[in-house]
């Protein structure tokens, strides 16, 4: 059960589903289902400059790193993500700059690495991170994804607001800083600009 992505729906549905199919034969349509879709244009930019260029050309594109939330859009709501870019090769988004009393954390940093970085400077935030999700989730989930998808039940934004965090945002070659509390405009609405 440690592989369950979220804690918000509990484990009961997983246990019920497992019991419901226990001993049943695997249906042919599951065995014969192709793994890859018919078209697979899957850009994976290796720098934030390459990502900014791709995103400017695909302003409605979906950015994926850990996919712990976005994956549910597909599996639970059958959402067509349209153009997708995979961010896990973008190493400059996976950096943590420890400046003593300040941390600058890239959007692609996993929650496991955030936890390791914040334990001393912000022990309460570290304790909170340790309590949500499983090791598998924290190894995949990124701090940028948790903020950008704007989930009203997101774990990090309230803590980051309380700590006075600032977001460093980029659109093409234009960069701006905004307090994280100003990024969240209304329920489900963020100060995000296409591209």
Model region roles, listed by residue range:
Residues 1-195:
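C-terminal structural segment of proteins
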């Amino acid at each position: 059960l440690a592989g369950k992505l979220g804690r918000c729906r509990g484990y009961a549905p997983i246990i019920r589903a497992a019991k419901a199919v226990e001993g049943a034969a695997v249906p042919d349509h599951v065995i014969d289902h192709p793994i890859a879709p018919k078209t697979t244009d899957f850009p994976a930019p290796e720098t934030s400059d390459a990502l900014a260029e791709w995103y400017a050309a695909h302003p409605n594109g979906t950015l994926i790193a850990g996919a712990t939330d976005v994956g549910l859009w597909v599996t639970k709501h059958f959402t067509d993500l349209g153009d997708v870019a995979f961010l896990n090769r973008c190493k400059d988004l996976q950096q943590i700059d420890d400046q003593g009393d300040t941390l600058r954390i890239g959007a692609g940093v996993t929650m496991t690495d955030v936890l390791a970085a914040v334990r001393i400077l912000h022990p309460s935030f570290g304790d909170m991170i340790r309590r949500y999700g499983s090791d598998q989730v924290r190894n995949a989930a990124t701090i940028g994804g948790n903020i950008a998808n704007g989930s009203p039940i997101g774990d990090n934004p309230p803590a980051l607001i309380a700590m006075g965090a600032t977001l460093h945002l980029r659109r093409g070659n234009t960069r701006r800083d905004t307090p994280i509390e100003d990024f969240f405009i209304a329920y489900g609405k963020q100060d995000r600009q296409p591209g």
